[in-house]
Amino acid sequence: MSKHELGFYSPINYQVVGYINGVLCVKKYIAAKTEPIQIFLWNPSIRKAVEIPLPRIVQSGFDTECAFGFDPITNDYKIVASLYFHGENYFLKFVEIYTMSKNSWKFLETEKCPSLLDKHHPKTYLDGLIYWIGIDPIENTPKGKFSHLVSFNVDKEALNYIDLPNCEIFGGTNHERFPIIFNRSIAIMDIYFEHTNIWARENNTWAKKYTINLRLFQKYVYLKSDGNLLHCGEQGGVNSYNLESKEVNVVAKSYKFVPSFTGCYMESMMLLNGFDDRNVFTFPNG
């Protein structure tokens, strides 16, 4: 197996849900982009994909969000699907969990789920846990709009909540907050219009590790394990910012498309043998 930087330039009707062990979870939309018509796991290195049956909660008029995880205890992949009323960003209605080995979905009790989640922000997987951001219905608080970190234990199928550090501004519209992997641990990226903060979890508290004086709002791409942060350049292309030296270098002068998903890809032979009871296909087929 070998590792590569992976940039995924998806057509408008495809979304990468997540990536684990050489396998990407991909969701395909119909033209209206509200109802997924296909969910599949894809191994780009061998161009093999396996179709996942749709969760029972998928229906017209609702948005279905997915998260991708791996259970290291049972060596099994799982997908978490959550349903929202179309146009409503935060209020969760139903949750289903797909288990790869069983090829089936089951409902998660809704009272165990947070009522407020931000469906638009990315999810991050690390060491058997899926992380995403929770929402505070009262935005003008010290924590701001994004109030807590939600984690889902893939093995135990249980949710946990961690309060996030206070924001420095209240009610600001130019603010992004999402989980990242930093030094092999979960961390938080706080992006404002003029600067960005990186918070790490240490001894059950949040510690601000870096302040980056760059305009990264809607320009952040990926934080590499070597401490180089990739972001879109002011004139197009992709730049690299080193957290320690603060040096900025041009990685690519221009890109035809902005990557919709970026990660460290590891080649593997997963999905090579296929499954007797599932639709395995070549992707892309051209």
Region locations from a protein language model:
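Short, conserved recognition motifs on repeat-domain binding surfaces
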Residues: 1-286
